[in-house]
Swiss-Prot record:
A motif (Q motif) lies at residues 40-68. Signal peptide: none annotated. It comes from Nicotiana tabacum (Common tobacco). One of its GO terms (molecular function) is ATP hydrolysis activity. ATP-dependent RNA helicase which is a subunit of the eIF4F complex involved in cap recognition and is required for mRNA binding to ribosome. In the current model of translation initiation, eIF4A unwinds RNA secondary structures in the 5'-UTR of mRNAs which is necessary to allow efficient binding of the small ribosomal subunit, and subsequent scanning for the initiator codon. Residues 252-413 form the Helicase C-terminal domain. This is Eukaryotic initiation factor 4A-8. InterPro entries: DEAD/DEAH_box_helicase_dom, Helicase_ATP-bd, Helicase_C-like, P-loop_NTPase, RNA-helicase_DEAD-box_CS, RNA_helicase_DEAD_Q_motif. Belongs to the DEAD box helicase family. eIF4A subfamily. One of its GO terms (biological process) is cytoplasmic translational initiation.
Length: 413
């Protein structure tokens, strides 16, 4: 097992104590700068082509409010404080900002992301890897409860990004397994949660071991005094972006889930539903444009009359399809999140999330269709084993309970 660095090596306890005293005595830059630019599409943000490919492949079509405001300043290298509820797309915001700036020819740790829990760190790692799939990003989660030796082996082989919990990351820094020489970006995710768990000292410990010039991003649902202390100590003229949660409601909409276990069982489940229920009009949401086309084809080969619309179609075609759907000449519409906010059909009695949304905030915009104008509606969510975490996050985000679909669902429509 690797030992801690001896006296005289890179980790110098006396120098550490001296730097920590300087840090705690410093008052930092206690002011914010404003940043008002809003980008309505990912294409307008000036991102690398292969990053855009990863974003679209992951299922994002239109940036959320925090992404519209927060990705570009991070990409520009500015220190940022982004305050928004969990589930609004913060993770993809800083992941995109990091992925845009990495030097992929240099296989050294250039970005460090701290998260309060092992589960969140592993979730961030998964998103980072997915968005950076076409860029060849090397990312690793350093968290407690896993093999220290395995962490050391992976770090020695080289990574671009480390995501981790404060305890394990500090341990890796102390052991010199994680060398901060090339580190340019430092992100604190769910900063308020991290501070409430007592990680303040460890965050300070880690920060003062990083290079002097490092870009800092702080992401948090709330901004308690301790979080503001961090911004004062570590950040230079940070851009502050505040996004409030949508003031929409799920009232009057009955929400259920169907445990389909595996992705390949969704189609049979969907067809069974349409054969047993008398549905006036319904909307089916999937996460990618390609899947819209695939599902439309599958439904039509089984003699279901469906319409489909997504962002690759020109506006004129989309308008014609929507007119047909509103008039009732087509009863089933298959679409993506991009169009969720524009479907204002009163007669829609059922929304089916064939895929759960990639961000909890989009759930509201999808199923809100069926409850507009005081009409009641039903939302049915198809849930695979991999979706269970997202279903939990959605229930927590909206403070709702989504029950398993009962056998008498026909009586509810």
């Amino acid at each position: 097992m690797a030992r801690l660095a001896p006296d005289g090596a890179q980790f110098d306890a006396r120098q550490y104590d001296s730097k920590m005293n300087d840090l705690l005595a410093a008052d930092g830059k206690d002011f914010f700068t404003s940043y008002d630019e809003v980008y309505d599409s990912f294409d307008a943000m000036g991102l690398q082509e292969n990053l855009l490919r990863g974003i679209y492949a992951y299922g994002f079509e239109k940036p959320s409010a925090i992404q519209q405001r927060g990705i570009v300043p991070f990409c520009k290298g500015l220190d940022v404080i982004q305050q928004a509820q969990s589930g609004t797309g913060k993770t993809a915001t800083f992941c995109s900002g990091i992925l845009q700036q990495l030097d992929y020819g240099l296989v050294q740790c250039q970005a460090l992301v701290l998260a309060p829990t092992r589960e969140l760190a592993q979730q961030i790692e998964k998103v980072m890897r997915a968005l950076g799939d076409y860029l060849g990003v090397k990312v690793h989660a350093c968290v407690g409860g896993t093999s220290v030796r395995e962490d050391q082996r992976i770090l020695a082989a080289g990574v671009h990004v480390i995501v981790g919990t404060p305890g394990r990351v500090f341990d890796m820094l102390r052991r010199q397994s994680l060398r901060p020489d090339y580190l340019r970006m430092f992100v604190l995710d769910e900063a308020d949660e991290m501070l409430s768990r007592g990680f303040k000292d460890q965050i300070y410990d880690i920060f003062q071991m990083l290079p002097t010039k490092v870009q800092v991003g702080v992401f948090s649902a709330t901004m308690p005094p301790e979080a503001l202390d961090i911004t004062r100590k570590f950040m230079n003229k940070p851009v502050r972006i505040l996004v409030k949660r949508d003031e929409l409601t799920l009232e009057g909409i009955k929400q259920f889930y169907v445990n389909v276990d595996k992705e390949e069982w969704k189609l049979e489940t969907l067809c069974d539903l349409y054969e047993t229920l008398a549905i006036t009009q319904s909307v089916i949401f999937v996460n990618t444009r390609r899947k819209v086309d695939w599902l439309t084809d599958k439904m039509r080969t089984r003699d279901h009359t469906v319409s489909a619309t997504h962002g690759d179609m020109d506006q004129n075609t989309r308008d014609i399809i929507m007119r047909e759907f509103r008039s009732g000449s087509s009863r089933v519409l298959i679409t993506t999140d991009l169009l969720a906010r524009g479907i204002d059909v009163q007669q829609v009695s059922l929304v089916i999330n064939y895929d759960l949304p990639t961000q909890p905030e989009n759930y509201l915009h999808r199923i809100g269709r069926s409850g507009r104008f005081g009409r009641k509606g039903v939302a049915i969510n198809f849930v695979t084993t991999d979706d269970e975490r997202m279903l939990f996050d959605i229930q927590k985000f909206y403070n709702v309970i989504i029950e398993e679909l009962p056998s008498n669902v026909a009586d509810l429509l």
